[in-house]
Amino acid sequence: MAKKALITGVTGQDGSYLAEFLMNKGYDVHGTIRRSSVDYRERIAHLEGKPNFHLHYADMGDSMSIMQVVAKVRPDEIYNLAAQSHVQVSFDAPEFTADVDAVGVLRVLEAVRLCGLADTCRIYQASTSELYGKVEEVPQNELTPFH
């Protein structure tokens, strides 16, 4: 039986590349997309319609939608790539950014726990090099100071 991966943020650059990579390795890939009046699925258009690619509506700000997807898919792996990723927006709307980027992680973890998958589901939490600010060394590592 194929492994099942759930990718939040599947329509982003990294999410679309990861979906294709995992599908080529034989995974059954499930991705989350937000309901929106704008169609932002151009990066995954070539994957849609393939038998091992599935889309689900969910929002990182809505714990129930995340819970429903995790309960339905019961993934072996979750790659949490969904985020409010615009630096300026993080300053203009800090509460929204924290809700999506920080509390959203908690929502994913709680969904895994409440669905009884804590011992079987592996989770990858993505982040950004923007956390470091103006860096003096490349690449960054766990000892790189924040500026």
Regions found by a protein language model. Name each.
Residues 1-147:
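N-terminal Rossmann-like NAD(P)+-binding domain of SDR-like oxidoreductases, especially those catalyzing
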